[in-house]
């Protein structure tokens, strides 16, 4: 996916208060009764009132071609809530709605449009509260405590459908084919779209659309749907309904990056940090039985144990996957943390990244050239930095107004407590020694001759992930680092934002009147002993970056307060999330991958063994979305990410890239 800006909808409100697109000269919904039309055309056309009680799965997936004001989604959500209230014991428990929108409304226009339907206000207010910023790609919104999931894909639907991961094929139970009229917006109503709808439709899946245009009916038939006409709503004579009565062959565009889930719903997670905590919640929400094994005596004693950590995206003009992943991960993280029903110290005070030398300033200039939404990042001149941050630096930079800091240790502990209330079982001081397959399960051998058997296993134990035979060849490395805890001063107390330079400095935590400054960086090290050299270097880096700032020289590290941790990282700065790849089988099966691309087998992996690792120094930003991606994959549900970015998160990616070029691969 190429980077491009998302333009907001160009609309006006007519005399009836109905939003009208200036670009397409068409209304977003009927002036007469848009709500009843939605119920008739899309809910009735897909027979949802009948299908919900009979649905044999816990999740029902609906996809839509044009989100617009969200009327269809809100109406469906209301109907789904009414269904759940009337059928609390039904198999169907959750709703997943996927929609595409090229020109999203602003939050203000969305709220104005929603005033048309007071009866939808309880649902509309939740949507407005989480409405995402205009970034390309998928924005996942978790609504109604996770019972309703909305995937909003911003961009051109005909481009986006070709970039969806193969794992979404045959997942859609019902299609809402909506949008501006074909005569007004012919670019959307293409055979490419109809083919994509058929590819994504589950056998037995349905579709409904307000139009009865002949080319639409024929196009959908050519794609594989069985079509019929139905009486239209109100004054409209006819509309179209369809059903996918056949099972279409499944294409596989990049089998070497194929993601496989599990038919089982019982898992063990190995680790004790933020990755484990958030993944536990994501799996429990999907009905999994989850057990956590932590080698330590308490959670968050590893890399997730710091007092303060900065939350902001990692952006790069020259790395599309990195840019796409972290921008969407950051916005998801903010939505996720804001609705978490647990307390943890945090302050969304903003983060300012400073150009303290020529190289860092050039990097910031490149980031600012990407036409980023002001909600995500804005330029800040040197003379304005003091006003924004509270301290003088003599540097210009880039500010992330929705960034800030949080306490990872408190977050991890309290999320795990919440997960325990939802059924999570935790065993502390269980150090996993090895694991092996036994009777279609995984046998876990712990220190002290303890054993356990589980259907599915997720390795999320940070830098220790490569200590098993299945993972020893992974191209990850350890990074030891020390964060200094410094007492505040009158000048430091004025710091209003997190400062990032050749290190970082947080505003004081009201809980202890200390700041965090860090962190040292020792690649390949797992040493967690206090280092006086690192303590002094943390201070000196601050002074070197801001040599004219007297407040920097007054930073006091003499009390030797610090915390040392070890992170797990990769050379491309992206997490590793997905199936644990089988190194030996990969080398054998893909020995001639450069020549056999079209005939390549699916990626060799260990069955029911997954990993969640290499979060590096940005785990607070990446962990929430990674947990959602992995839980969705494991549950065989829609994944909130495009195929190319998902490939960049695949644990086998560094091997496959070399094999595709005919190059040799080395372990580690």
UniProtKB/Swiss-Prot annotation:
Q: FAD-dependent cmnm(5)s(2)U34 oxidoreductase: where is this region?
A: 270-668
Q: Which reaction does it catalyse?
A: 5-aminomethyl-2-thiouridine(34) in tRNA + S-adenosyl-L-methionine = 5-methylaminomethyl-2-thiouridine(34) in tRNA + S-adenosyl-L-homocysteine + H(+)
Q: Taxonomically, which superkingdom?
A: Bacteria
Q: Which stretches does the entry tag as region tRNA (mnm(5)s(2)U34)-methyltransferase?
A: 1-245
Q: Which InterPro entries match?
A: FAD-dep_OxRdtase, FAD/NAD-bd_sf, MnmC-like_methylTransf, SAM-dependent_MTases_sf, tRNA_MAMT_biosynth_bifunc_MnmC, tRNA_MNMC2, tRNA_S-uridine_synth_MnmC_C
Give the record's GO biological process terms: methylation; tRNA wobble uridine modification
Where does it reside?
A: Cytoplasm
Key word tRNA processing present: yes
E.C. number(s) listed in UniProt = 2.1.1.61, 1.5.-.-
Q: Which UniProt keywords apply?
A: Cytoplasm, FAD, Flavoprotein, Methyltransferase, Multifunctional enzyme, Oxidoreductase, S-adenosyl-L-methionine, Transferase, tRNA processing
Name the Gene Ontology molecular function terms of this record.
flavin adenine dinucleotide binding; oxidoreductase activity, acting on the CH-NH group of donors; tRNA (5-methylaminomethyl-2-thiouridylate)(34)-methyltransferase activity
Cellular component, GO, one term: cytoplasm
Give the family per the record: In the N-terminal section; belongs to the methyltransferase superfamily. tRNA (mnm(5)s(2)U34)-methyltransferase family.
Q: What is this protein called?
A: tRNA 5-methylaminomethyl-2-thiouridine biosynthesis bifunctional protein MnmC
Highest classification ranks of the organism? Bacteria, Pseudomonadati, Pseudomonadota, Gammaproteobacteria, Enterobacterales
Gene name?
mnmC
């Amino acid at each position: 996916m190429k980077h491009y800006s998302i333009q907001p909808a160009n609309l006006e409100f007519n005399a009836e208060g109905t939003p009208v697109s200036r670009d397409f000269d068409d209304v977003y919904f009927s002036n007469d009764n848009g709500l009843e039309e939605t119920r008739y055309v899309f809910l009735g056309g897909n027979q949802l009132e009948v299908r919900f009680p009979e649905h044999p799965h816990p999740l029902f997936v609906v996809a839509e071609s044009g989100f617009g004001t969200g009327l269809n989604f809100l109406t469906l959500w209301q109907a789904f809530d009414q269904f759940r209230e009337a059928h609390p014991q039904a198999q169907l428990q959750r709703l997943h709605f996927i929609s595409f929108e090229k020109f999203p409304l602003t939050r203000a226009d969305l709220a104005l449009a929603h005033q048309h339907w007071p009866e939808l206000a309880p649902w509309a207010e939740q949507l407005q509260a989480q409405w995402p910023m205009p970034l390309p790609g998928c924005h996942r919104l978790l609504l109604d405590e996770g019972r309703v999931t909305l995937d909003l894909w911003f961009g051109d639907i005909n481009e986006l459908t070709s970039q969806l991961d193969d794992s979404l094929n045959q997942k859609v139970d019902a299609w809402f084919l909506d949008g501006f009229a074909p005569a007004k917006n012919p670019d959307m109503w293409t055979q490419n779209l109809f083919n994509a709808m058929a590819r994504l439709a589950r056998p037995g899946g349905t579709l409904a659309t307000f139009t009865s245009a002949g080319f639409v009916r024929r196009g959908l038939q050519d794609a594989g749907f069985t079509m019929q006409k139905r009486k239209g709503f109100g004054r409209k004579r006819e509309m179209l309904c369809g059903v996918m009565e056949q099972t279409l062959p499944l294409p596989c565009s990049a089998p070497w990056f194929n993601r496989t889930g599990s038919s089982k719903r019982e898992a063990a997670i190995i680790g004790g940090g933020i990755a484990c905590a958030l993944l536990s919640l994501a799996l429990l929400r999907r009905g999994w039985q989850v057990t956590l094994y932590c080698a330590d005596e308490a959670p968050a004693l590893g890399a997730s144990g710091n007092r303060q950590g900065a939350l902001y995206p990692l952006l790069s003009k020259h790395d599309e996957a990195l840019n796409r992943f972290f921008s969407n991960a950051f916005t998801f993280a903010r939505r996720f943390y804001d609705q978490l029903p647990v307390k943890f110290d945090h302050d969304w005070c903003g983060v300012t990244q400073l150009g303290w030398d020529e190289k860092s300033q050039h990097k910031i200039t490149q980031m600012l050239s990407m036409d980023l939404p002001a909600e995500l990042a804005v330029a800040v001149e040197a003379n304005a930095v003091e006003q924004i941050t509270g301290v003088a630096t003599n540097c210009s930079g880039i500010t992330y107004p929705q960034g800030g800091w949080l306490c990872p240790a408190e977050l991890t502990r309290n999320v795990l407590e919440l997960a325990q209330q939802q059924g999570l079982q935790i065993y502390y001081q269980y150090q996993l020694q090895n694991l092996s397959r036994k009777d279609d399960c995984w046998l876990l051998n712990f220190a002290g001759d303890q054993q356990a058997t589980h259907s599915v296993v997720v390795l999320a134990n940070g830098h220790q992930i490569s200590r098993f035979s299945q993972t020893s060849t992974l191209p990850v490395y350890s990074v030891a680092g020390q964060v200094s805890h410094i007492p505040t001063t009158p000048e430091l107390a004025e710091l209003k934002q997190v400062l990032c330079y050749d290190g970082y400095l947080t505003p004081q935590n009201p809980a202890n009147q200390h700041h965090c400054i860090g962190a040292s960086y020792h690649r390949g090290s797992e040493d967690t002993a206090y280092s006086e050299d690192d303590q002094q270097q943390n201070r000196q880096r601050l002074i070197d970056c801001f040599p004219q700032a007297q407040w920097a020289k007054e930073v006091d590290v003499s009390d030797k307060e610090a915390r040392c941790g070890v992170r797990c990282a990769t050379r491309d700065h992206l997490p590793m999330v997905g199936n644990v790849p089988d190194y030996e089988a990969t080398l054998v099966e893909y020995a001639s991958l450069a020549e056999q691309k079209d005939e390549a087998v699916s990626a060799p992996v260990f069955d029911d063994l997954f990993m969640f690792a290499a979060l590096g120094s940005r785990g607070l930003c990446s962990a929430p979305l990674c947990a959602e991606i992995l839980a969705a994959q494991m549950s065989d549900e829609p994944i909130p990410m495009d195929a190319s970015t998902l490939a960049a998160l695949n644990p086998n990616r560094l091997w496959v890239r070399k094999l595709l070029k005919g190059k040799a691969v080395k372990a580690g």
